[in-house]
Amino acid sequence: MPAPALERQDSGIDVHPTSAHFIQQTLKLYATKLKVDASAEHHLPRNYMSRYDNFAQTDRMKQRSLDGRSEGLTLEDVREAATAAQPVFNETVRKLAEAADLDPDAVVLFEGKPLVKNAEKGTVYSRLMIGPLKGEARCREKTRDDYGGDFGQLLDVVRCSIIVDTEEQLIAVTRLLLEGGNVVRLKNRFKYALFTGYRDALFSIVIETPSGVEHVCEVQLH
């Protein structure tokens, strides 16, 4: 759906170039949203995810240092705990994918071709994508802008993405996560899409480190 051009001569209104650019960009964004919405209706006809509301167990949404502290944490405290949680998290999400009958290492296909992640590097998306720890600069920026300087609220230093092909796979992973009892927050953007129409689901899950300290990690479901 091409964005309509502004017709100054028809309306007789002199539109400032900045305003005209803003309007055109808004129309393009809206056209993109309509395409995304149409794609979602095509690929998610049963709307299974609509049954799940967002929720948050705020009393458990706080990181701890490896010595058990939850107050006055530094970024180093959080990253040290994240490093300890990472191997346990990796094993947990691989088992999760396999329990949903997904091959964690399978290459994701789009229109019959591997879905490219980085063309220059020649990398493609796999069913399970486990990222490195969130970078220090981004952690500091997010803590400053979103959490008032409280590093203990960083819940996605350890994270992964699971990419599915079907609505049945989507609901299978969701059910396994929720039935596991370790989800402390769900942001269900399949039900509550972003203004662009983009949809996914973000699960904050508790992982226990080898020393027994809980660490909150993120599973992104696409």
Placement of each model-derived feature along the sequence:
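Charge-rich, low-complexity segments
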Residues: 1-154, 171
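Long beta-strand-rich cores associated with HINT superfamily self-processing modules
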Residues: 143-222
